Structures are given as C-alpha cells and as structure tokens.
C-alpha cells in the first residue's frame, strides 16, 4: 500500500511504459486481421517505444497519446476502440505523477490503463476475459508491482473499465 515518501525515478517511468507497450501490442494483435488501426495509434505506439528506448518525455509524446485517444473516440466502440485506448495509455504512462499528491488514486490508470484496455479489447472481440486477465498477471514485472504499491487503490466507479482496473490493482498488490 501507500508508503512514506516513496520516490519515482526515470527507470520506473520507462518500466511502466514498456509494460504498457507490451500490452498495447497484444491488444492490437488481438483485433480482427482485416481491421486497420488508425495511424494515430501506430504513431503513439512508436512514440511510446521511443520513450522506452531513451527518448524524451515531451509534448510530442503527450500529443501522440492524445491523438490516439481522439482516434479511439472516433471509432466509438469495439476492439479497435480499446486497442487505440491501450496505445494512448501506453504513451500516456510516461506522465505518471510521483506519489504523494491529491490525484494518487487516479495515477494507477497511468500504470494499468493499457492493461485494462487490453482486457476490454479481448472482451469486445468475444474472447475470454479471464484468460486475458491471466495473461496480464503473468507478464507483470516486479518493477510494476513495486510501482503500484506506491499508490492507493483506485476507485472502481460505475463502468467496466473501473471494475477491471480495481481487480488488476488488487490482484497485483
């Protein structure tokens, strides 16, 4: 759970983005073969990968995340919607705030957002959400577990996204 004065470093941010990129790619791979992902999704995934490889946490990365988010909104629903949101979350994971602020519970979305969207993508594809959840659980590096323990449990809210977010958080921490 929330520790006294934990710190957040660049390695933790890069680990979080790398984890998110992995799940975003899995979401993209899960959508129908005939489905073409909006170019904004490809750009956001490339930007996130660039960050993991040592690139800057800058406005271009933030814009790529927002462009993928807007592309998802244009799609509206279905597997491609969730795949685009997963990619947006991967690029946005670089903007995690250090623990200790008033938005701490919200920050878990930066860490687990791509994972949540991966599970929702599998569900929207008619796949087994329990298997998708299991896939997420088997690929979580220790660094992400440690990072999550710095933040309080998120609020589930009324949507499926929030329920999956809380289930993942509880299972990991």
Regions found by a protein language model. Name each.
Residues 143-173:
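Acidic, carboxylate-rich catalytic segments that either coordinate divalent cations
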Residues 1-137:
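Structured binding/interaction patches within domain cores
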């Amino acid at each position: 759970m929330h520790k006294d004065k934990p710190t957040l470093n660049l390695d933790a941010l890069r680990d979080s983005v790398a984890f998110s990129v992995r799940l975003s790619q899995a979401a993209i791979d899960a959508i129908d073969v005939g489905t073409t992902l909006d170019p904004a999704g490809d750009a956001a995934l490339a930007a996130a990968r660039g960050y993991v490889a040592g690139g800057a946490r800058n406005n271009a990365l933030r814009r790529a995340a927002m462009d993928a988010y807007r592309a998802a909104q244009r799609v509206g629903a279905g597997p491609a919607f969730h795949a685009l949101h997963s990619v947006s979350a991967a690029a946005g994971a670089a903007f995690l705030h250090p623990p200790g602020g008033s938005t701490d519970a919200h920050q878990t979305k930066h860490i687990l957002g791509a994972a949540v969207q991966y599970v929702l993508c599998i569900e929207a594809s008619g796949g087994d959400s329990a298997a998708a959840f299991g896939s997420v659980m088997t690929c979580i590096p220790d660094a992400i577990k440690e990072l999550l323990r710095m933040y309080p449990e998120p609020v589930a809210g009324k949507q499926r996204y929030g329920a999956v977010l809380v289930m993942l958080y509880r299972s990991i921490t």
